[in-house]
């Protein structure tokens, strides 16, 4: 039986989130509803999750000594990475020394912090289908990889980046230099490394939210949410919907791939597994060992949304991945470059049938920064997508 304490008392169950953006904020709220004391960590002050947590801490999470000092000072029960830009070797060191338990595991955090670790695990160790790929350290290596068999069109991504930053499509030789420069500008490490992938002419792409949680006997079991369809622009999520229809054979393959990858990563929690689908064929793309941006739709569609599932799973509590209603989400962009912006049209957005919105509270807006999301439940996903985009379009961010 799992025992939970009382926040701000000696009995408290204390959870530290490394990364406190909009996804982390919802995880923190889910944890607090279960009586957990929360510590929100980010690289800048007043991050969305810091606005709702019991404690807010601001450090450079990629600095191993800062990270170690904070964990040793706060003594959390669990450390939950919510972003990739973390000193994961230090997390591994602290977990190995018995200082803290990392969710899902320190190894999973390390392997998924960059595209190389997880791609080599999936394709070379586990043998799951992926697009053809090469890793390159220079423009010359990139061109050689394309010429040697990757071919055109292809996709180039920094090995370390988030939210589609630095990702582009190469249609021919004239695009190679531009794609390399864009990847270098968008990566989290200067003079970085890229992955170039052969283009898969897929029918659609999905996120399969996969949950590793304990059953009544205490054994970890794998459960799946209904597939989530989504549209990405330059690798960044724009809208998502659930459920996305899939042929039974394709769904079975998707679940087999997701279970193989997440079982190897181990631990407990929710994973966002991204997959390409063409007919009955399925290819693994990426995995995040945490709630996924496309999964925000579950706040409108599931009895327990992805954040509640993650919170329950990491605490050893029962989970329910079942669907409540079809639904969709659509991103609300900042529209302006400013701090402390205002939002007009909120009432108009909420007049859309079945709608809800989340405004993330990010202190600084950029024209294409995700500042909120519209959520809609409806009788079918087509209706939900139309209404979600309508609701999102009614919110008008502006300089205050």
From Swiss-Prot:
N(1)-(5-phospho-beta-D-ribosyl)glycinamide binds at residues 22-23, 82, 293, 362, 369-370. PROSITE patterns: ATP_GRASP. PANTHER family: FORMATE-DEPENDENT PHOSPHORIBOSYLGLYCINAMIDE FORMYLTRANSFERASE (PTHR43055:SF1). GO terms for biological process: 'de novo' IMP biosynthetic process. The keyword Glycoprotein does not apply. Mg(2+) binds at residues 274, 286. The gene is purT. It comes from Variovorax paradoxus (strain S110). SUPFAM superfamilies: Glutathione synthetase ATP-binding domain-like, PreATP-grasp domain, Rudiment single hybrid motif. GO terms for molecular function: ATP binding; magnesium ion binding; phosphoribosylglycinamide formyltransferase 2 activity; phosphoribosylglycinamide formyltransferase activity. Residues 120-315 form the ATP-grasp domain. Pathway: Purine metabolism; IMP biosynthesis via de novo pathway; N(2)-formyl-N(1)-(5-phospho-D-ribosyl)glycinamide from N(1)-(5-phospho-D-ribosyl)glycinamide (formate route): step 1/1. Belongs to the PurK/PurT family. Its EC number is 6.3.1.21. Homodimer. Involved in the de novo purine biosynthesis. Catalyzes the transfer of formate to 5-phospho-ribosyl-glycinamide (GAR), producing 5-phospho-ribosyl-N-formylglycinamide (FGAR). Formate is provided by PurU via hydrolysis of 10-formyl-tetrahydrofolate. The keyword Magnesium applies. Keywords: ATP-binding, Ligase, Magnesium, Metal-binding, Nucleotide-binding, Purine biosynthesis. This is Formate-dependent phosphoribosylglycinamide formyltransferase. ATP binds at residues 115, 157, 162-167, 197-200, 205. One of its GO terms (cellular component) is cytosol.
């Amino acid at each position: 039986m799992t025992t939970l304490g009382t926040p701000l008392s000696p009995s408290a169950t204390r959870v530290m989130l490394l990364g406190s953006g909009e996804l982390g904020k919802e995880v923190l709220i889910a944890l607090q509803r279960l009586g957990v004391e929360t510590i929100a960590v980010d690289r800048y002050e007043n991050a969305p999750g810091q606005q709702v947590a019991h404690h807010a801490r601001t450090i450079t999470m990629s600095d191993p000594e800062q990270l170690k000092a904070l964990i040793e000072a706060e003594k959390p029960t669990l450390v939950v990475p919510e972003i990739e830009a973390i000193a994961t070797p230090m997390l591994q060191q602290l977990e190995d020394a018995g200082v803290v338990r990392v969710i899902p595991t320190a190894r999973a955090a390390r392997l998924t912090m960059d595209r190389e670790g997880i791609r080599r695990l999936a394709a070379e160790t586990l043998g799951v289908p992926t697009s053809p790929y090469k890793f390159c350290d220079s423009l010359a290596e990139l061109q050689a990889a394309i010429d040697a068999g990757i071919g055109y069109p292809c996709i180039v991504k920094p090995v370390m980046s988030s939210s589609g930053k630095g990702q582009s499509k190469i249609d021919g030789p004239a695009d190679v230099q531009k794609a390399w420069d864009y990847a270098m500008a968008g990566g989290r490490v200067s003079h970085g490394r890229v992955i170039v992938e052969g283009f898969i002419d897929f029918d659609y792409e999905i996120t399969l939210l996969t949950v590793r949680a304990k059953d009544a006997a205490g054994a970890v079991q794998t459960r799946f949410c209904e597939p989530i369809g989504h549209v990405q622009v330059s690798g960044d999520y724009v809208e998502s919907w659930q459920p996305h229809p899939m042929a039974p054979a394709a769904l079975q393959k998707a679940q087999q791939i997701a279970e193989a990858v997440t079982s190897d990563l181990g631990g407990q929690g929710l994973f966002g597994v991204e997959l390409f689908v063409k007919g009955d064929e399925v290819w693994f793309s990426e995995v995040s060992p945490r709630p996924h941006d496309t999964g925000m739709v579950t706040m409108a569609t599931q009895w327990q949304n992805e954040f509640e599932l993650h919170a329950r799973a990491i605490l050893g509590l029962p989970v329910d991945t079942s669907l409540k209603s079809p639904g969709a989400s659509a991103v609300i962009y900042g529209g302006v470059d400013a701090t402390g912006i205002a939002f007009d049209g909120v009432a108009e957005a909420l007049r859309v049938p079945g709608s809800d919105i989340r405004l993330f509270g990010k202190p600084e807006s950029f024209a294409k920064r995700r500042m909120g999301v519209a959520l809609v439940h409806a009788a079918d996903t087509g209706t939900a997508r139309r209404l979600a985009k309508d609701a999102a379009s009614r919110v008008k961010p502006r300089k205050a």
